[in-house]
């Protein structure tokens, strides 16, 4: 075993134990509602958002279904104490005296805060060719490049704004992919979500900018329940990226989001996530519970949805970005890197549901386990009886660092059409003494060696991220691997 205390390897120890740099809560005057979840809470959230009646009914229907479910799902390979849903704040937002009409009206302190977090929103410094919607606790505080996008007919705004301005689109698509009765956490989200992003790409338009949403949980007693809805009309294309951080608290916060994607005929949606929620301290105390439902519907012929995710944060991750391949010749893709360290737990993967003819799906999953963490891949490939000529390829690779981490793979294949072709391969490997020694002999220290091995292991996934975010994701993995060889 490699001695991480030797002078040559001390850099690796430092690399692995880097402090979480987004950990300080930001000080603002905050508007909240009382803890607890009742029908009155739902009505109060809807009232604060000034919502039409159909949205209140949508929420109440979800809340009543959630009450009927009574228990969280227990099949995931996860261990955590029971969540007290009555000891949580369901609405938290920076106080604002009036509705904001432009970035110029946003509190300068708030803008400065996002800049410190690496998300500049001001005109002079904002990210080139990337439109950003910044979500702070329960509300959107700023959206960039809205006017430029509007010239192309692209709608990109907070979902609360879309409810007011585009009710017909919301009625048609909200809940069409993830219903109000889908699962325990999606029901909770549908009942209490207060913001998120809405995007509509009109027919035959290729969105001229990358779209991005940045999520920040700042209140230690509140959960975050954002909802994202993206609709790509016929012949359109959009690339969307989300990122997230949270302060360090000794207690756990709940993040229960829902993402719905709809791709019509010949449309393509590329959805990328770099998730860096606070993962807890070195003893496993604190951190975010990341219980998320993400699903895309390839509703039209020749449509395509690609999920790419880099998961490095949160104490517990429970998410399965999925594709329902309804349209003939539609394509679903899933590229994932899930890194766990210390006492993190992840149960993540995907579902590919083949319904239409000649549908294709591709799954590339890379799991990296270090410290005392456990990392599970769970995948479902389902070929329906009418999915003539369906094709799937799945590759699930796990990499272990150290002697105390775990990696698990739970593939599930349901094939009901004899013309289908399904391939599945999996591997588990470990970074060993010989590999590190090989690098050391060539003048490369252990810190760089680990980074190079990890980078090569994840390259196929990083290649599917927008270039500037692929570079950041590569750095992020290096920073997260603290004390991982011993």
UniProtKB/Swiss-Prot annotation:
One of its GO terms (cellular component) is cyanelle. InterPro entries: Fe-S_cluster_assembly_SufBD, SUF_FeS_clus_asmbl_SufB, SUF_FeS_clus_asmbl_SufBD_core, SUF_FeS_clus_asmbl_SufBD_sf, SufBD_N. One of its GO terms (biological process) is iron-sulfur cluster assembly. Pfam families: SUFBD_core, SufBD_N. Keywords: Cyanelle, Plastid. The keyword Membrane does not apply. The keyword Plastid applies. Its main location: plastid. It comes from the Eukaryota. It is found in: Plastid, Cyanelle. Belongs to the iron-sulfur cluster assembly SufBD family. This is Iron-sulfur cluster assembly SufBD family protein ycf24. It comes from Cyanophora paradoxa. The lineage of its organism: Eukaryota, Glaucocystophyceae, Cyanophoraceae, Cyanophora.
């Amino acid at each position: 075993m490699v001695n991480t205390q030797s002078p040559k390897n001390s850099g690796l120890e430092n690399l692995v134990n880097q402090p979480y740099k987004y950990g300080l809560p930001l000080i603002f005057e905050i508007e909240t509602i009382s803890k607890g979840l009742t029908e009155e809470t739902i009505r109060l959230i809807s009232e604060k958002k000034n919502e039409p009646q159909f949205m209140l009914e949508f929420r109440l229907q979800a809340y009543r279904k959630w009450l009927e479910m009574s228990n969280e799902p227990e099949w995931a390979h996860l261990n955590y104490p029971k969540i007290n849903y009555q000891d949580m704040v369901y609405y938290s937002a920076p106080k604002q005296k009036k509705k904001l009409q432009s970035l110029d009206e946003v509190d300068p302190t708030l803008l400065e805060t996002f800049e410190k977090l690496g998300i500049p929103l001001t005109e002079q410094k904002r990210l080139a060719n990337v439109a950003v919607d910044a979500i702070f606790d329960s509300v959107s505080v700023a959206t960039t490049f809205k006017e430029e996008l509007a010239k192309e007919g692209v709608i990109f705004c907070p979902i609360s704004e879309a409810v007011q301005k585009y009710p017909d689109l919301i009625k048609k698509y909200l809940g069409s992919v993830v219903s109000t009765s889908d699962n325990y956490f999606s029901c909770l989200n549908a009942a209490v979500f207060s913001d998120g992003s809405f995007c509509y790409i009109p027919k035959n338009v290729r969105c001229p900018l990358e779209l991005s949403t940045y999520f920040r949980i700042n209140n230690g007693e509140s959960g975050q329940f954002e909802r994202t809805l993206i609709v790509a009309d016929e012949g359109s294309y959009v690339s969307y990226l989300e990122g997230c951080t949270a302060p360090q608290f000794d207690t756990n916060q709940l993040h229960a989001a829902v993402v719905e994607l709809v791709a019509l005929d010949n449309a393509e949606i590329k959805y990328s996530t770099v998730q860096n929620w606070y993962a807890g301290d070195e003893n496993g105390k604190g951190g975010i519970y990341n219980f998320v439902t993400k699903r895309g519907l390839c509703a039209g012929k020749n449509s395509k949805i690609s999920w790419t995710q880099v998961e490095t944060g949160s104490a517990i991750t429970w998410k399965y970005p999925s594709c329902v391949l309804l349209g003939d010749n539609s394509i679903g893709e899933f590229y994932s890197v899930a890194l766990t360290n210390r006492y993190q737990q992840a149960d993540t993967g995907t579902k590919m549901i083949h319904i239409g003819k000649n549908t294709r799906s591709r799954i590339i999953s890379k799991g990296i386990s270090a410290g005392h963490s456990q990392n599970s891949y769970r995948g479902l490939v389902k070929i329906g009886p009418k999915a003539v000529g369906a094709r799937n390829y799945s590759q699930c690779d796990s990499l272990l660092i150290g002697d105390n981490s775990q990696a698990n793979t739970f593939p599930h294949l349901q094939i009901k059409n004899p013309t289908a072709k399904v391939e599945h391969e999996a591997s588990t490997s470990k970074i060993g003494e010989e590999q590190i020694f090989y690098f050391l002999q060539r003048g490369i220290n252990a810190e760089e060696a680990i980074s190079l091995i990890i980078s090569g292991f994840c390259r196929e996934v990083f290649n599917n991220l927008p270039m500037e975010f692929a570079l950041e994701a590569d750095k992020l993995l290096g920073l997260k691997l603290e004390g991982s060889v011993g």
